[in-house]
UniProtKB/Swiss-Prot annotation:
<dbReference type="InterPro" id="IPR009012">
    <property type="entry name" value="GrpE_head"/>
</dbReference>
<dbReference type="GO" id="GO:0005737">
    <property type="term" value="C:cytoplasm"/>
</dbReference>
<dbReference type="GO" id="GO:0000774">
    <property type="term" value="F:adenyl-nucleotide exchange factor activity"/>
</dbReference>
<keyword id="KW-0963">Cytoplasm</keyword>
<dbReference type="Pfam" id="PF01025">
    <property type="entry name" value="GrpE"/>
</dbReference>
<keyword id="KW-0346">Stress response</keyword>
<comment type="similarity">
    <text>Belongs to the GrpE family.</text>
</comment>
<dbReference type="InterPro" id="IPR013805">
    <property type="entry name" value="GrpE_coiled_coil"/>
</dbReference>
<dbReference type="GO" id="GO:0051087">
    <property type="term" value="F:protein-folding chaperone binding"/>
</dbReference>
<protein>
    <recommendedName>
        <fullName>Protein GrpE</fullName>
    </recommendedName>
</protein>
<dbReference type="InterPro" id="IPR000740">
    <property type="entry name" value="GrpE"/>
</dbReference>
<dbReference type="GO" id="GO:0051082">
    <property type="term" value="F:unfolded protein binding"/>
</dbReference>
<comment type="subunit">
    <text>Homodimer.</text>
</comment>
<dbReference type="GO" id="GO:0006457">
    <property type="term" value="P:protein folding"/>
</dbReference>
<comment type="function">
    <text>Participates actively in the response to hyperosmotic and heat shock by preventing the aggregation of stress-denatured proteins, in association with DnaK and GrpE. It is the nucleotide exchange factor for DnaK and may function as a thermosensor. Unfolded proteins bind initially to DnaJ; upon interaction with the DnaJ-bound protein, DnaK hydrolyzes its bound ATP, resulting in the formation of a stable complex. GrpE releases ADP from DnaK; ATP binding to DnaK triggers the release of the substrate protein, thus completing the reaction cycle.</text>
</comment>
<dbReference type="GO" id="GO:0042803">
    <property type="term" value="F:protein homodimerization activity"/>
</dbReference>
<keyword id="KW-0143">Chaperone</keyword>
Length: 186
């Protein structure tokens, strides 16, 4: 062995291994071992890349779930409050014109109308919008046909009466509009 090369020669290694049982001697070369280590390293790199990708996918999914939860958190409450808005609207519609002009009822009517406007404003601020229905073709994704009525004025399949207003919350249906649809007269 030279001073510059501290690695033992093959002859020195063979001399050292004399007397050691054959099944205990590792005869793999450095190249084989290096190739095996490189393969293990590549496998580990792939595993790390897959783990990173999975982590990113989980993070994106969680961010979407959180965004959806924020956007649609009021859905249950909004459905419940729609009946209040419906009843207020019906109450206003049921007040006869002569009572609306009566001094005794003017303030009451004005208060009910202001409450209706406030409900619409709150709905709007939470992304809740009324679905357009009157005069439009029936859209099964937004309208629920309750009855068909003969009509000479409207095309068959056109909404001619809104029985109950429908609402969307952001891009999701909160409640379909209950409508009457035109059909050909008999």
């Amino acid at each position: 062995m030279s001073d510059n090369d501290t690695r033992p020669t093959d002859a020195e290694v063979e001399a050292e291994l004399k007397g050691v049982p054959e099944d205990m001697i590792d005869r793999t070369s450095d190249n084989d071992e290096l190739a095996k280590l490189r393969e293990e390293l590549e496998t580990a790199r792939q595993d790390v890349l897959y783990a990173k990708a999975e982590t990113q996918n989980v993070r994106r999914r969680m961010e979407k779930d959180v965004a959806d939860a924020r956007a649609y958190a009021a859905t249950g409450f909004a459905r419940d409050i729609l009946s209040v808005a419906d009843n207020l609207s019906r109450a206003l519609e049921s007040i006869p014109a002569d009572l609306r002009e009566d001094d005794k009822f003017k303030n009451l009517v004005a208060g009910l109308e202001a409450t209706g406007r406030e409900i619409e404003k709150v709905f709007s601020s939470h992304g809740i919008v009324r679905i357009a229905a009157m005069g439009l073709p029936l859209d099964p994704h937004q309208h629920q046909a309750m009855i068909e009525m003969p009509s000479a004025d409207a095309e068959p399949g056109t909404v001619i009466q809104e029985l109950q207003a429908g609402y969307m919350i952001k891009d999701r249906l909160l409640r379909p509009a209950m409508v009457a649809v035109a059909k050909k007269p008999d």
